[in-house]
Amino acid sequence: AQGVEFRDLTFGQALEQARTENKLVFMDCYTSWCGPCKNMLKNVFTLPEAGEFMNAHFVCVKYDMEKGEGIGLKKQFAVRAFPTFFIIRPDGTVQHRLAGGSQWERFRERVARGLEETTSYAYLNERYQQGKLARKQYSHYVQALKDAGDRPAVKNVCMEVFGQLSDKAKCS
């Protein structure tokens, strides 16, 4: 058994391969000096169970955000922290965004939420922006924002939801 298979592809080739294989693209945005990035590559992505899960669902690629194609991708996807991971549809649109590394079990949960359309960052964010987010979806949305590392949005959404509650509900 092997770990995650990161393929040596350009971003365009990765999208094409994802279309061909009917998968999503998993993109690891890292830098050479980032400690958590190195930890993910050495201790998490090398696990056989990580490989089994990730390789089944994704065309996996990684790019150094300070070299080559990574420089443009960093701008295109507004990468502000390392590591940042994206789940990208074959049409190039982002389905889910994950900021920061973690142990495999936790990382797998975070990735799984992004695989599921209705708990993915893009879906929930779009519903929220359109004012169509159901009350029971707010907890999923806050989780997706946390996964994406968007702390200001987490605070705003929580304050908004709290503000909509009745006085009785606020105290229960």
Spans of model-derived segments:
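Non-catalytic, surface beta->alpha helical segment in thiol-disulfide oxidoreductase systems
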Residues: 79-120
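A short beta-strand-turn-helix
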Residues: 7-24
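Detector for the c-type heme attachment site
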Residues: 38-42
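Oxidative protein folding and maturation machinery
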Residues: 128-172
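Thiol-based oxidoreductase modules, predominantly thioredoxin-like and allied folds used
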Residues: 3-9, 29-31, 43-70, 79-82, ...
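Short active-site neighborhood of thiol/selenol oxidoreductases, capturing the structured segment around
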Residues: 21-34
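TPR-adjacent "capping" and linker segments in tetratricopeptide-repeat scaffold/adaptor proteins
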Residues: 114, 118-134
